[in-house]
Amino acid sequence: IGIGECSYLPKLNPEKLDTYESKVAEVCERINEHEFWLDKGLMGFPSIYFGLEIALLDLEKKGSKLLFDSDFSLSEQPIPINGLIWMGSFENMMQQVDEKIEAGFRCIKLKIGAIDFEKELHILKSIRKKSSEIELRVDANGAFPPAEALEKLKRLSEYNLHSIEQPIKQGFPATMNQLCKESPLPIALDEELIGKFTKQSKAETLENINPPYIILKPSLIGGIKGSKQWIELAEERHIKWWITSALESNIGLNVISQFVATTKNTMFQGLGTGKLYTNNIDSPLQVIGDEISYNKQLNWDLSGL
C-alpha cells in the first residue's frame, strides 16, 4: 500500500474547497489513469497532485516510507531547520524566542505584520541583544502596503536580518521587482509562486521579479515535480531557495524532508511544523535541537489511519 497526503490550507491553496473532496474522489475512482493525473489532469490542484505523487512513490517502494535515497534516509545526516515564532502579543512572542534560543536554534523565523510594527522592531532588537549570531528571518505574509514597504524594509534591515518573505501581497510583479532592486534586506518570494503551474509562468515570475530567494511549499506548488521545476529555473538564474512544509502531518513532512536531503541544499529548512500537531502520526522523524532526522530505530504507526 502506498500512502499519500493531501494538505489543504484555506486561503492559500489555489483549489476551491467546495470541489476539493469530489476531485479527490474522482482521482481515486480513476486511479489507474495516474499517468494522466500526473501529467495534466491535476493542473490547478497542487495538493491533490502531491498526495497522489507520494502515494505512488510509496507504493513503488513497497510502503516503506523510504522514498529517496540519501544520508538522511539512512539516519546518518540530519537537516538543519529554523525555529518558527508565531504571531501573538509581544510577551508571547518573546517567550517563544527564549524557548527557541534555549533549545539551540541557530535560525529563527518570525511572522510579522499582525501587531504594531514598532513592537515587532522591539522584538528584533531584543533578539539581537541576546545574540548577534542567530540567523533571523521574517515573514510578512504580504502585510505591508506597497507605499510603506520600502521604508519598513529599511528599518528592518537595521537588525541584520537574513531575509523577509513576501513583504507585499502577491500579484504585483512590477512593484515587487522594484522592491527587490531597492531593498537593503533580501526578499524571498513565497505566496508569489502559488498558481503558477506551467514552466513558462514560473520562468516569467522569476524573470519579472528577480528575487534573491524563493520558498517552496510542495503542497502549494505541485508536489516534488513542481518543486524540482522551480529549483531548476531558480538555479539557472542564481536564485537561492529553501523548502517549507505547509502544516503537513508526518506523512507529507517525511517526503519533503527526504526530498530536500537529495538536493544537497545546506540552508535552514522550514521543516519543524510536525510538533504543532496533537494527533500526529508516530514516525521515525525526530526534531532534536534545530535539526530534523530520520531515526530508523523508530517505527511508523499507521493504526490511526
Residue ranges of each PLM-predicted region?
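Short, acidic/polar
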Residues: 88-100, 147-151, 195-207
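Active-site-adjacent beta->alpha loops and helix N-cap segments on the catalytic face
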Residues: 90-92, 114-128, 144-148, 168-181, ...
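N-terminal capping/lid subdomain adjacent to the active-site entrance of alpha/beta enzymes
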Residues: 1-136, 141-143, 157, 283-305
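A beta-strand-loop signature enriched in Asp, Gly, Thr, and Trp
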Residues: 167, 174-244
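Flexible, glycine/charged-enriched surface loops at secondary-structure junctions
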Residues: 67-71, 134, 163-167, 244-246
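Flexible C-terminal active-site loop/helix
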Residues: 244-305
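Glycine-enriched alpha-helix->loop->beta-strand junction motifs that scaffold or abut catalytic
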Residues: 102-106, 130-133, 154-162, 178-187, ...
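Catalytic beta/alpha-barrel core
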Residues: 86, 106-116, 135-142, 160-172, ...
